[in-house]
Amino acid sequence: MSTMKKEERLVNKVTRLLRRANIPRWLHHYGPKKFETYVLCIGLLIKQIYQLSYRRAAKLLAEYYSIDIHFTTLQKAAKRLPRSIWQSLLAATIEFKNTHLAAADGTGFTRSGPSQYYMKRIDRKTLVGKPVQAITMIDVEKRKFLAGCFFAKPHGEAKQVSRLHKQSPTVPDVLLMDKGFDAEYLHQWLNEHGTFSVAPVRKNCVRGRHRKLMRECMDWCLYWQRNIVESLFSALKRLFGTSIKSQKSPMINAELFCRLIAYNIGLRLWTFS
């Protein structure tokens, strides 16, 4: 496939997502209407796919897409685009209506800080900076990310499952979780909202109707399919990198949501080679 057709395919995918998510053509009400929403989204997606800086992403847009945009425009877009827009775009990548089996888990992304060589030279023993926490929900059968939430500081994973469940475009019938998500209030909330949760019971936890059911009738063959979420985390880090360059929460959300969106719609570095 020629380079021109690949460029048109990327533009068509992004514009189709924006229409499906009901995102306006312009994100600001006042001021000059110079760059449409799809231009900003393409620039931020390309930055994550190629793992570029903002300057090089703007230069690539100018050379291959004939879009003359300053790199600070992309920086401001990453900072100002609300999290709801990114979640709407991620939900727009899901074209199926039913999710039989889903899984939720968390992972971490390192911050781009001093290198290990520099740390060794200054005789630093302790770690510098805290990793970015990512908690996501995936469709096990389709291998797609349904929802995600990201934090610059550590948060309780079990408390975010209800948030992921509400943001998911489809309601999963069964949700697989590891032992860290075992909480009776969470199991009850999921049952009330049409999802049966499967998670191993914590040690020395005896109270709770759902926990008693899991202790007596745990389906381990079904539970081990939860490993698919670990495979998706591995693929995400191998394709788009293991580190985060941004420091502020809005820009961290933009970086990680762009990676999830690019993965769901099949944008890889090898598709542009």
Residue spans of the language-model regions?
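Major-groove recognition helix of helix-turn-helix-like DNA-binding domains
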Residues: 67-83
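Charge-patterned, long linear interaction tracts outside catalytic cores
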Residues: 247-273
